Each structure stands twice: as C-alpha cells, then as structure tokens.
C-alpha cells in the first residue's frame, strides 16, 4: 500500500515520509535548465515529441541500443530530477505563488523527459538484453506517478495543478472566534493537537470540521488533475493512472489489487477486535449519546485528524493495570529536550548501529521547527536532495512522544537513501515503495523501554508485567493504520478508473471508511464537501 509515499522516482515525491523523497542538485544545473524548451525531454531521448509508438518501433532493437538508451536516460533524468528537487524543497518550505510556479516549471521539465523516456523504453519490449538493462527499461515505463499528457500546454497544467493543490493544503487554516472573542487562525498542527489532547467531544468536532472545510475548494483542481493524469497514463498504454501505479510491484495490476485484499483479510479479525474494544472504552468515557453500542465510531474521537492512528487515546482505552510505567512526552519536557536534540537522539540511534553521522549539511538545511514568518508544508518527510548525500528532513516538530518516534522513522528513510546512493540513478530507490516504509517502521518499533533507558530518557525499564500497555499502544498506532492505508489507495484507484464519479466523491470516501475502518463522520456531510482531500496523500 503506497499511502505513506505519494510517489516514487518520477514524481520525485517519493520517500518524503511522506514522507517523500526529493532531491536537488548542482546549483548551476537549475539555472541552465531554466532555458531549456519545455519539450526538451523528447528531444534529449532522440524521438520527436509527437511520434507514435508505431513510428518508433519500425525496426527491431538490439541489446546494445537498449543499454545506450538507458545510460543516456539516466544521465539526463538525474540532472532534471536534481533541478526539480531543489525547486520543490524551496516551495515546500516557503509556500508562495512564485515558489509554486518555479517548482511547477522544474517538475514539468522533468515530467516531459520522463514521459518521453517511458515511451521510448516501450519500443524495446522483447529485446534480449542483460538483466540490469531490462530492469531499467521496466522502471522507465512504470515509475511515473504523475503521468502528464504529451504536449507542453497540458504538461504544464499538470505540474501547475500539483503545486497548487499542495500549496492549498499547506496553507490551510480554520478561522474561529477565540475565548477572548477575537478571531484566531488555526493550522493543521494546532487542530490536530486539539484532537490529540482534548476530551470535549464538541471541541474535537469543531476542530475536525474546521480542518475538513479547507478541502472544499480543491475539488475543481483535483478533477482536472485526475483527468490529465489519466490521459497521460493512457498514452503510456495503461487503462488509467491507478493501473499504472499498481504495475510497479512485479505482478499484474489486477493481481496486486487482489493480493492487497488477501493480506487485509488476514489482519481484519485482529482489527475488528481492536475496534470493538476501543468503541466499548470510548462509550464508557463519553456515554451512549456520543458513542453507539454497535456500529461505527465517530471519527473525531480517535485522537487523530484522520483516525489513522489511535495512540493519543491510549489513556482513555487502556486497562487500569496497563500503565507502561512512564510518560515519554513528560520525560522529554522534564529533561528539557528541544526539537533539535530529539533529532540528535535519532542520529545517535543509527550511529550505535554502525552508521556514519549525518552530513553537516543535514543540520544546516533541514526544517525542524515551523517558521513564524512563512507558510510551509508541515507534513513530515525525508529528503535526498541531490540523490547523493544532501539528506534533510522537513518537520514541524513538537516535543512529544509521537514526534520522537516519527523522527526515528524519517531518519530511517535518510539512512536508507544514503545506503543506495552509489547505485545507478534508476536504482536509487527501494525495490518498491513498501521497503522504504518498512525500514522506517522497523526502526520506530525499536523505540522500546530498553532503548529509552539506554539513552537516559527513563530511569528504569518497566517490568514485563507492564508490556500490555506498550503492546496496546503499538496496536493503536500500527494495527489501526492498516485499513486506512488500504482505503486511501482503494479510493484513488476507483476515482481513476471512473468507478467513483465526481458526484460521488464524498459519499464514496465515507463508504470506504465505514467498510474498512468502521468509522463515520461526526456530523452530516454532503457532496459540497471533499473530505478525502483533507488528507495530504489525496490532495
């Protein structure tokens, strides 16, 4: 399931923890590329911008030609990717109309080249070449995540829409009257904190509704974005963009969808048990007027804006004898650990495993704290900005246990990125998206009481009798997430295939959330709402 990462190589939005990966590169590269024609990619790879697949496949291709093509494609895409990565970093950490436009232009140059490369790679189908070259040809054909149609106008529109949608999400705020009667503007972090800490259902409902209102204006741009992506995917030979996405896992797209359902069926009984238990405990806390005895749980009561992780409600649902013996958030604050030192803890974790320290530039260029003077995309992400060693993270860190774990997860991406930075450019990624997230989550699972004692954050390791609390917390975060990750992809696939029409966008979203998560919105929703886009990975 590719929820945690909007894309892979050719969207250049991979591994941003997004988490996302991005790279950038030589400063002179971006300036030089500014002068390239918008369809430079097609010319670089030696094919006319509008030639057909039939024209390109007149004569059989040789192994030598295939290798020469992939070698050249890698060099050109590397430069274009680095230029886009740098521009996208600036846009994500300083959202303005100008930075969105610059990032969109750089993205378009890269996308044009990637589309041209994908089409040219298809002309080598059936060629007898070495395994490495064949793998590169496959990656060139399927690695696009935002397939733009051929033609400078529509290609430019795709990248502009992508930048604008992300900007709308990053700048989203809910305006309400504060306790003093004055208007106050709350961003996602502040609204999420209300859901994480408040125990007032009305206050939580207002925060939930407030954030979801920011997604309404996105629908028109989203519709056009889907239309153009589908057109681009069909030009590459896929039914739709969803089929393109599902083709990346070394199995047929339909087989991948069936495999995901098969795996979910294995986990579903455990999730249903957790859901029933949590619903019962919340009903005991809030009463039958707020939480039903049977049926879905109201989405605003689970401690997270999207009800994707439930760890923040652990104090409400844990058995009385399940106290883990420590409060990590409290301990961080007692020891006056600031945001930067939290990242230092993460770096020392990896150094204890034998890895080299992060580069000096990591500390100079990363975004650790939300700036007060500009808009940024706070969504936690790990970046490899030059596809080499310019590693960074982008987070609006809060001093709490959740962000302490997230930092370790994000650094897992960074150290993985550095581990493969000597590979050919097309191989500078995980074998598929799942590996990147698996590494991040495996590292996060290592944040145990034993580790916390070793680094001095707790004084003594709790006895084994306290494990139930720790295991429950893990289930609330990890098991609870699985159906959400699945349904986000199911939703996007259905939109791309046309199974879900624009008139059904919101109903389809809540139908899937009921089916997989067993949750419902806290108040009446309509097709004027676009609640799915209140989640970064949809917007």
Language-model features, listed with the residues they occupy:
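Long, amphipathic alpha-helical stalk/connector segments used for oligomerization, subunit docking
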Residues: 449-538
């Amino acid at each position: 399931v590719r929820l945690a990462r909007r894309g892979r190589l050719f969207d250049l939005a991979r591994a941003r923890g997004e988490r996302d990966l991005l790279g950038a590169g030589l400063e002179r590269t971006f300036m030089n590329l500014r002068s390239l024609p918008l369809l430079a990619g097609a010319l670089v790879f030696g094919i006319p911008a509008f030639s057909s697949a039939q024209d390109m496949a007149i004569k059989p291709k040789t192994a030598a030609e295939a290798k020469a093509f992939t070698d050249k494609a890698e060099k050109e895409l590397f430069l274009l990717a680095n230029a886009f990565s740098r521009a996208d970093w600036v846009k994500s950490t300083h959202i303005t109309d100008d930075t969105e436009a610059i990032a969109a232009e750089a993205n378009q140059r890269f996308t044009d080249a990637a589309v041209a490369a994908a089409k040219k790679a298809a002309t080598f189908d059936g060629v007898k070449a070495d395994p490495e070259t064949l793998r590169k040809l496959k990656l060139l054909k399927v690695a696009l995540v935002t397939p733009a149609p051929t033609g400078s106008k529509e290609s430019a529109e795709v990248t502009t829409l992508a930048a604008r949608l992300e900007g709308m999400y990053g700048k989203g705020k809910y305006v309400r009257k504060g306790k003093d009667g004055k208007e106050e503007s709350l961003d996602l972090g502040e609204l999420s904190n209300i859901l994480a800490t408040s125990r007032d259902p009305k206050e939580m409902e207002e925060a939930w509704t407030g954030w979801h209102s920011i997604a309404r204006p996105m629908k028109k741009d989203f519709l056009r974005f889907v239309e153009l992506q589908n057109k681009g995917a069909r030009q590459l030979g896929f039914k739709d963009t969803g089929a393109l996405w599902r083709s990346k896992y070394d199995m047929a797209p339909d087989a991948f969808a069936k495999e995901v359902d098969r795996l979910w069926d294995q986990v579903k009984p455990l999730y249903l048990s957790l859901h029933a238990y949590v619903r019962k405990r919340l009903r005991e806390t809030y009463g039958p007027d707020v939480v039903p005895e049977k049926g879905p749980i109201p989405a605003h009561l689970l401690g997270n804006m999207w009800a994707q992780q439930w760890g923040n409600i652990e104090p409400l649902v844990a058995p009385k004898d399940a106290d883990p013996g420590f409060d990590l958030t409290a301990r961080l604050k007692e020891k006056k650990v600031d945001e930067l030192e939290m990242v230092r803890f993460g770096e020392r974790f990896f150094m204890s495993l034998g890895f080299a320290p992060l580069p000096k530039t990591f500390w100079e260029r990363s975004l650790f704290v939300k700036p007060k003077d500009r808009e940024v995309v706070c969504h936690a992400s790990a970046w490899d900005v030059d596809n080499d060693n310019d590693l960074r993270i982008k987070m609006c860190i809060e001093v709490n246990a959740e962000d302490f774990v997230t930092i370790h997860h994000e650094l897992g991406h960074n150290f993985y990125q550095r581990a493969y930075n000597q590979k050919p450019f097309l191989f500078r990624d995980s074998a598929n998206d799942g590996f990147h997230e698996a590494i991040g989550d495996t590292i996060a699972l290592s944040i145990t009481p034993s580790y916390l004692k070793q680094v001095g954050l707790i004084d003594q390791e709790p006895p084994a009798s306290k494990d139930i609390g720790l295991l429950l917390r893990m289930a609330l975060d990890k098991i609870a997430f699985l159906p959400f990750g699945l349904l986000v992809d199911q939703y996007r696939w259905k939109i791309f295939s046309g199974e879900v029409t624009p008139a059904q966008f919101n109903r389809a979203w809540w139908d899937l959330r009921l089916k997989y998560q067993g949750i419902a919105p806290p108040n009446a929703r309509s097709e004027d709402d676009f609640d799915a886009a209140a989640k970064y990975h949809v917007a």
